[in-house]
A protein has these predicted regions:
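C-terminal helicase lobe
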Residues: 2-6, 10-138
Length: 138
């Protein structure tokens, strides 16, 4: 378990799992943070768990900041884009590529949206594993 500040200093190739327990501030931040996993070319996972309150809290923090209006507006737009990404049902790889000006016609087949089927997914085992990891780190 690491904070953003700690994570920025990590140069470790064998990170296998990155978990966000709230919405990152922007797509750029998110990509930087999840990019820490799988640097050695091996399989890795990134999880994003959030609630509607995350966006509300961050927008409140932006509004109450002493930053200039143009920066507040930019921060809110970036936050809206991040929330849209998190709530989307489209291929996550394609969404990220599009954000950075790239295009792909094919779905990745690896993200949660590409792997979902018509049936509901029982996330209880995955959630238990995640919560156990969080619990052990405190």
């Amino acid at each position: 378990m690491a904070t953003i500040a700690f994570g920025m200093g990590i140069d470790k190739a064998d990170v296998r799992f990155v978990a966000h327990t709230s919405l990152p501030k922007s797509i750029e931040n998110y990509v930087q943070e999840i990019g820490r996993a799988g640097r050695d070319g091996q399989k890795a996972e990134a999880w994003l768990c959030f609630s509607g309150g995350d966006a509300f809290f961050q927008k409140k923090r932006i509004a109450e900041s002493e930053a200039e209006d143009w920066y507040k507006n930019l921060s809110e737009v970036k936050q809206d884009v991040m929330q849209g990404y998190a709530e989307s049902t489209e291929c996550r790889r394609n969404l990220l590529l599009a954000y950075f000006g790239e295009k792909s016609k094919e779905k990745c087949g690896q993200c949660d949206n590409c792997r979902v089927t018509e049936k509901s997914w029982d996330a209880s085992t995955a959630v238990k594993k995640f919560l156990s990891t969080v619990w052990r780190s405190y």
